[in-house]
Amino acid sequence: MVLSQLNGLTSPLDERHVHALQIALKGMTPTQLAWVSGYLAGIGGGPLRMPTEPKAVERITILFGSQTGNAKAVAEQLGARASEQGMDARVISMGDFNPRKLSKEQWVLIVVSTHGEGEPPENAYALHAFIQDQGAGRLEQLPFAVLGLGDSSYEHFCRTAVDFDRRLAELGAQRILPLQCCALDYRSDTERWSSDALNRLSALAPRKASNVVAMPTLRSHQDLRSHQEQSRNRARPYDKDNPYTATLLENRRITTLDAVSDVRHLALAIEPDAMHYRPGDALGVWVENDPSLADTILAGVGIDGAARIELGDEELDLRHALIERLELTQLHPTTVRGWSRASGRTGAEDAGERLEREEQTRIYLAGNDAFRLPDAGDTPLIMIGAGTGVAPYRAFLQQRAANGHPGRNWLIFGNRHFHRDFLYQLDWQAHRKAGRLDRVSLAFSRDGAEKPYVQQRLREEGKEILRWLDAGAHLYVCGATAMGQAVDHALVEIFTIEAGLDPDCASLRRYPARECYATDDL
């Protein structure tokens, strides 16, 4: 901006001051102007300020419900774009949001995933339950829009997003955009919805009023080019669309050869600064199809693998698409396999078996803020896992041992056979011997006629479970969706029978403060 432009703007300077500045600054070099700019800011005690309007700036609240981190990432990107456009936007986990304050919000955008059989993510459970309640208040003054993430192959595709969109409208809230449900390959849909939402809000909501007078930025063309080059070269964080290429150090089968499941323990070399993970996080792994299968398909249909095709917004050769981008059994885009840290996934044993030492694979970090160790190191832990769901607890105990945390630990683990499927058995024995594993309850369902499962062990240990919870224990559940539901039912029985609670209030999911209960589905 030049001084002649001040006359056309809202300015604290009258015509006399503008004229005086024009005379004083006439003929100054860029270096002299830069010095004067700093001098004026200094004697003013800080940035030169414009008068602001007394009315409060309207705020946009972006709420996310996320199980594996995808919805959180989309919400954060949306918030960053809103802020760049001058909007007063804040991004909040639904788990950190007080549902009773929903009616006081001015603009709400919801980004939420669905997991299990149409269930809300852990951090969305309380808000989801609150608005579904018959006593939820009216929300006539609340403009909103909902974006859902899910897997279209499931029966209850984006069920949680549908629930939020429907119920908010029933409560009188004003829908400013139609519900958008995004499948696994969601990037283009989320970007389009985000643009539509911000365009809509820009027409409805005022920008944050600036209280700083714009001053000219004095930079040479050379400096500007250098700055632009640095911006382009700035490292982009690794995510689903920009995966990190890791080197495989170890591929070890941790079930016996006669076990039903070929479960693999994979060790990957990751540069220390590439990603910062915590116990409870998962790795998203882009697993490639066997090149020989791709070649067989191409030979069978008589198509040259070098033929160029369009896949979404990208153009690539057909063979490359068959190996890296398409699910060969259905020819829809491949999806990321979510592997718990230090674990194999039973559903991906073929892919894990193909990986050889020193081979490379594409990964990204799928953070899970709902599945974390408690901050207090003396908090007792009850860790319930079935099959490969036991893997996060290996990381939990390693972290507690490294930190010297004294909290008691109880592992409840189930699988098919003791001798074939006791995953990480030597690790648990070492922790037990070192005094870091206070209790171990096991359930192997194929070793005898009894067929016990982890939920049966819970019922048998009901009184002790209550004692640990009364002492402040955090309870974790990791395994298949059906197993998690069975555990929840067992806990309801325990609280009903042992504690005398009403069944409608007995589940840990119904507690107002649910930090003591965390689940992670495989």
UniProtKB/Swiss-Prot annotation:
One of its GO terms (molecular function) is sulfite reductase (NADPH) activity. The keyword Magnesium does not apply. Residues 241-399 form the FAD-binding FR-type domain. InterPro entries: CysJ-like_FAD-binding, FAD-bd_FR_type, Flavdoxin-like, Flavodoxin/NO_synth, Flavoprot_Pyr_Nucl_cyt_Rdtase, Flavoprotein-like_sf, FNR_nucleotide-bd, NADPH_Cyt_P450_Rdtase_alpha. GO terms for biological process: cysteine biosynthetic process. Catalyzes the 6-electron reduction of sulfite to sulfide. This is one of several activities required for the biosynthesis of L-cysteine from sulfate. The flavo-protein component catalyzes the electron flow from NADPH -> FAD -> FMN to the hemoprotein component. It holds the Pfam family NAD_binding_1. It comes from Thiocapsa roseopersicina. Its EC number is 1.8.1.2. This is Sulfite reductase [NADPH] flavoprotein alpha-component. Its cofactor is FAD; FMN.
